[in-house]
Amino acid sequence: PDKNSSSAETAVFDLIDPSFCDVVIIQSDRFGNYDFCKALAQKYREMGLPVISLGENISDCINFEYRRGDGFAVIVSHMVKYHGYTNIHMIAGVKGEYYSDERIMAFRNVLSENNIPFDDSMVSYGDYWSVPAIDAVKKLIKENRLPRAIVCANDQMAVAVTNYLQDQGISVPDDVAITGFDGIETIYSADPTVSSSGIYPLTNAKEICHAVNTIFSEGYAAKNIPLFPELIINESCGCKSEKHRMKFNSSASYNELMNKFYRFQDENIILSNISERIQQCKSFADIADEMRKDDLMYAMTCVIKSECIDESVNPEEKIQMRFRNKMFVLYDSDDIDLKKSVGEKFIPYNMDGRDIIPNMNGFIGRCLIFTALSYLGVPMGYTCYHFSSYIPSNYYKIPQTVNMLNNALGGLRNLRHQHYLLNKVDEISRIDALTGLFNRHGFLIEYENILRGLGSNSL
């Protein structure tokens, strides 16, 4: 979400009543908007809800502090102290960005502790992406400044730089040692595997669960919980890979990648067809059948604001809505299937906004994934996915499906509003503004309509 807290992405939080929650967990370091996370946490705390913030320190919350600077210092220290590299260069993230600057400071501190002089030429910027990182290395090669070791501010850049140097005939780690940061899965499929530092997801999950259990058993108390990234030893730094930490199955990974790619292509075609059919609907009541024709939208519910089905409302107009308002259940795959099994038809209906989704208690034990629906910056509602089992491909398709619904529903709203306006213009053109009676044009049209209605009985 951007810094405008009324944006479509953030406005969805006004549509969901949080009072049913036992604990609210905000992944604040992923929002990219500290002020919004702070306001959200404050609202939930005022409601008496325990709040856990992941990544950012927020007052009166249980804050998980991800000590990324300390973690980056660990990987730099490994390069300097263990391997003895002194001719070392850093490819940072975005210039002036907080996390990038934090890692630069960690880099400088480690060099200072080991009496290695630092100057600004020892830092390049790769914007956390592959191409800028490779461009930075090309510049070093062109200027004949290729160092003995390169530490990258994230794994994406480290893998890209490793591949590029290898393609140029420069051995990693024999000629240039490389490290990354974050600990993403890709580092294990690189050749050589890339050394890194990161907080293991399982470690993170265990700590969060422990914090939640503590709230239930001992009560809520705001505090800061530090989590430190762990060193991940692989081959790109000059070490042997820690095979015991994670075994990489190249065959399984390749098959999964191919399945993602081809399934993505096939599903995009299906979703495009669904989008076309939705926008050809005469009303929102017809949409559910079109969405369920293809067996792609299962285990999901789509709830929109009631004014979205009102053709007279301008689709570009932002109307403030709260969870106490009525919401419109546009689609419910489970209900559709149930009614179909007994020969009935699903009919969209209004629902109390405080219910969030129909039959919510029936999904106890499932992970509910909510995503905002918006079009041209105007919030429309949300979808809720409630898969009963963990099949990765189900989760991969969520962004595709939501993007399709955003465009299809937004497009339909525009078309229906245009149809409404045309009818109003036509209606105005038939009526005399002074008397309210048909004018000549309106009378002739109405007369012709009456004749058509009479058919062969007309005189």
Label every model-predicted segment.
Residues 1-77, 142, 156-158:
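Alpha-helical recognition/docking segments in bacterial nutrient-uptake
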Residues 59-90, 101-109, 130-138, 158, ...:
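Hydrophobic alpha-helical segments within soluble ligand-binding/sensing domains
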Residues 138-242:
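Flexible loop/turn connectors
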Residues 240-280, 421-427:
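Signal-transmission linkers at sensory-effector interfaces
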Residues 358, 365-374:
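A short, aliphatic-rich beta-strand micro-motif
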Residues 390-410, 419-423:
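Amphipathic alpha-helical "output/dimerization" segments
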Residues 424-446:
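Conserved nucleotide-binding and Mg2+-coordinating catalytic segments in signaling enzymes
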Residues 446-459:
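Active-site-proximal structural segments of metal-dependent nucleotidyl cyclase/transferase enzymes
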